[in-house]
Amino acid sequence: MGTWLKHDVITIVNAPLDNVWYTWSDLDSMSLWMSWIESVKTIDQETSTLPDLTEWTLAANGFKFKWKAQITERIEKNKLKWKSIGGLPTQGSVIFESKGDQLTSVHLAVTYELPRMIARFMEEKILGKMVTNELQANIDRFRDLVEKNYNNESTN
């Protein structure tokens, strides 16, 4: 068994909640703004025994991991929670909160089990800081993508 690490990051997006929720809900597009995520594929609901199932591939620093994740709670325009089903043990949530007409807060919390093979090579505190920084950069790229798309919609 490995060590569990938790990371929390927050950003404020200068766009309405609807736009922010819509962009995040397109799980297959997450690799556009999550640099360590190589791909996310939605599993065909007709062939899967579990609802809301996705297959994730993470590739970073010479390591590659795959896992399936299931959305365990979906509150439209408010919250998504998930947990892994096999593969890399992970769980998390993202909470959206309107801060006025054009501002939306996005709070991402990710918890995962650090595999022993990585723990042997990396000190937990160093890895924890690196992952938190990467998640913050990812959520900031998400913010930039939503704001760019929203501004393009507003000017057309």
Roles of regions detected by a PLM:
Residues 1-49, 152, 156:
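Hydrophobic ligand-binding cavity/cleft-lining segments
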Residues 9-11, 67-73, 91-98, 110:
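Hydrophobic/aromatic beta-strand elements that line small-molecule binding cavities or substrate pockets
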Residues 13, 58, 110-112:
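Hydrophobic beta-strand positions in extracellular immunoglobulin-like domains
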Residues 83-137, 153-156:
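Beta-strand/loop substructures that line and gate deep hydrophobic ligand-binding cavities in soluble
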